[in-house]
Amino acid sequence: MKTILAVIFFGILAFAFADYPSIENCTHPPAMANFNQKKFLEGKWYVTKAKHGSNSTVCREYRAKTKGNDQILVGDGYYSFNGGTFYFTVRCKRLPNKEVQKPLQFTCTQKSTDDPSKMFKFQLEVTILDTDYANYAVMYRCVQFPEQLGSHFEDNTLLLHRNPDQLVDENQVERKLNLSFDSFRSREDVVDGCPKLPSKKKNKAS
């Protein structure tokens, strides 16, 4: 088990001190057949369940956008750091990869809007196990920390929804993928619900 002082996108670490299972490298499960990268990488996705992490993990929301020729994942939100909760901006730029059965690869930057010294760069890999694109997705994602943070790996499996208030039949997804969400942390268990993000005018995405 490792204790890491960092806060990472996609629920890799939702608080400053977090124990995750130790892994030596990313172990991606098989990607869904005929995965359509373009359809997945558009619009908003909300994390509703997570194998590892905290309430912040299952409160994560992110969106995809195109900036010129680049595909960008935006994961702005609240993260815990040094005993407090702070708002961070997150930008993940997709690296070129046209092979549908290969993990989606991104290079990411996460930084505090109040303290420029709180900035982290990391590599992200994503494999989609299953999705209908319009309602839900099951995603395995793995992060490689930079050398200054130990050069190790952390992974997680997430259940995503387009609308966190309109959930699919999880039993069907479990049977299809031969997995169980029983031990996963759920957005529905967050006391008082997930916090609202600041207005876009106050924290305009760059």
From Swiss-Prot:
One GO MF term attached to the UniProt entry: toxin activity
Family affiliation: Belongs to the calycin superfamily. Triabin family.
Signal peptide extent: 1-18
Alphabetized InterPro entries for the sequence: Calycin (IPR012674), Triabi/Procalin (IPR005657)
Protein name: Triafestin-2
Gene Ontology cellular-component terms listed: extracellular region
Glycan attachment positions: N25, N55, N178
Organism: Triatoma infestans
Location(s) in or outside the cell: Secreted
Protein's UniProt keywords contain Glycoprotein: yes
Keywords: Blood coagulation cascade inhibiting toxin, Glycoprotein, Hemostasis impairing toxin, Secreted, Signal, Toxin
Tissue specificity field: Salivary gland (at protein level).
GO BP of this protein: suppression of blood coagulation in another organism; symbiont-mediated perturbation of host defenses
Function recorded in the entry: Suppresses activation of the host plasma kallikrein-kinin system, leading to inhibition of the intrinsic coagulation pathway. Blocks host coagulation factor XII (F12) and prekallikrein (KLKB1) reciprocal activation without affecting their amidolytic activities. Blocks binding of host F12 and high molecular weight kininogen (KNG1) to negatively charged surfaces. Attenuates generation of bradykinin by interfering with activation of host kallikrein-kinin system.
Gene3D superfamilies, per database record: 2.40.128.20
Regulation: Zn(2+) modulates binding to host coagulation factor XII (F12) and high molecular weight kininogen (KNG1).
Quaternary assembly: Interacts with host coagulation factor XII (F12) (inactive and activated) (via amino acids 1-77). Interacts with host high molecular weight kininogen (KNG1) (via amino acids 402-532).
Xref: Pfam families: Triabin
Keyword Transmembrane helix attributed: no
